[in-house]
């Protein structure tokens, strides 16, 4: 079965997190977060999701900020390679064609409420962490999870994401933007280096990310700066320059709009949390 070899026990991970402030994370492939205990808040460029135990998030490849609000939380992470997802769509194409098509912009995060069937599926996935099993069993369990997603109220959104994966330009665009978003390029430079006309580039970008290139680049830069702020000793002015902001004052304004406080206050809060933990 296609993809079975890549979905062994080591791929499904049980994580224990205690994140008082927002922490920057990069997912190099699509996947599912399942909140087992505690709290979990996940933000992308235009949405915030606060999960209760039993709820699930399908997240696309990309960058996010996460927090557990200082609570000990247990999360199940299920990575999904593009190859596996494409195989799922091909394998069950006739059945999945029954899912209503969605014309809305494709989101970066899709939330799924807890249901008895999803709870049973998650229980089976957790069992794979503690018992030896054939790799194909993990594949079947994850296909079951995706099928439940597809025929839930959020199924049309999920299918929009999965159908995009068959477009060879989508993954190339994602890799290209992750590599070059810090470059001081005009939008025309991005489109030229990608090998597309500006109008076509904008259309592809909007269909993949659901926002304009300028908005996405600004968000990625502010998230990168946030990560440096919390995890390095660089000065704020150096962080602003490193993340592609024209000045410290512009960075401070952008950061305040995004996180509701100044960079210096955010760093102070991180240091206070660290002192309490010590």
From Swiss-Prot:
In the absence of inducing signals such as low Ca(2+) or host cell contact, the T3SS/injectisome is expressed at a low basal level and exists in a quiescent state due to ExsA sequestration by ExsD in a 1:1 complex. Upon host cell contact, this interaction is disrupted by the anti-antiactivator protein ExsC leading to ExsA activation. Signal peptide: none annotated. Induction: By cAMP-dependent DNA-binding protein Vfr that directly activates exsA transcription from a promoter located immediately upstream of exsA. One of its GO terms (molecular function) is transcription cis-regulatory region binding. GO terms for cellular component: protein-DNA complex. Keywords: Activator, DNA-binding, Transcription, Transcription regulation. Disruption phenotype: Deletion mutants are defective in expression and secretion of type III secretion system-related exoproducts. Pfam families: ExsA_N, HTH_18. Residues 171-269 form the HTH araC/xylS-type domain. GO terms for biological process: negative regulation of protein secretion; positive regulation of DNA-templated transcription initiation; regulation of DNA-templated transcription. Residues 188-209, 236-259 bind DNA. It comes from the Bacteria. PANTHER family: ARAC-FAMILY TRANSCRIPTIONAL REGULATOR (PTHR43280), HTH-TYPE TRANSCRIPTIONAL REGULATOR EXSA (PTHR43280:SF2). Homodimer. Interacts with ExsD; this interaction inhibits ExsA activity. Transcriptional regulator that plays an essential role in the activation the type III secretion system (T3SS) operons. In addition, ExsA directly regulates the transcription of ImpA virulence factor that cooperatively inhibits the functions of host macrophages together with the T3SS. This is HTH-type transcriptional regulator ExsA. It comes from Pseudomonas aeruginosa (strain ATCC 15692 / DSM 22644 / CIP 104116 / JCM 14847 / LMG 12228 / 1C / PRS 101 / PAO1).
């Amino acid at each position: 079965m296609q993809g079975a070899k890549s979905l062994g026990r080591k791929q499904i991970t049980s994580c224990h997190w205690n994140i008082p402030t927002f922490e920057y994370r990069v997912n190099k492939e699509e996947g599912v977060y399942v909140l087992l205990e505690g709290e979990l808040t996940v933000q992308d460029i235009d949405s915030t999701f606060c999960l209760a135990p039993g709820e699930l998030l399908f997240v696309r490849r990309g960058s996010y900020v996460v927090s557990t609000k200082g609570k000990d939380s247990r999360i199940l992470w299920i990575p999904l390679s593009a190859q596996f997802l494409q195989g799922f769509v091909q394998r069950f194409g006739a059945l999945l064609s029954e899912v209503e098509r969605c014309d809305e912009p494709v989101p970066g995060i899709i939330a799924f409420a807890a249901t008895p069937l999803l709870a049973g599926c998650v229980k089976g996935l957790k069992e794979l962490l503690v018992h030896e099993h054939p790799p194909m069993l993990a594949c079947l369990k994850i296909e079951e999870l995706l099928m439940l997603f597809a025929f839930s109220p959020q199924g049309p959104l999920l299918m929009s994401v999965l159908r995009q994966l068959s477009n060879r330009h989508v993954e190339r665009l994602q890799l290209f933007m992750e590599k070059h978003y810090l470059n001081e390029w005009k939008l025309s430079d991005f489109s030229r280096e990608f090998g597309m006309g500006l109008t076509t580039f904008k259309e592809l970008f909007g269909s993949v990310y659901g926002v304009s290139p300028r908005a996405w680049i600004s968000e990625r830069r502010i998230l990168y700066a946030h990560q440096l702020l919390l995890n390095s000793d660089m000065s704020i002015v150096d962080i602003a320059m490193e993340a592609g902001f024209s000045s410290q004052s512009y960075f401070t304004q952008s950061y305040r709009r995004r996180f509701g406080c100044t960079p210096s206050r955010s760093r102070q809060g991180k240091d206070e949390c660290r002192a309490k933990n010590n």
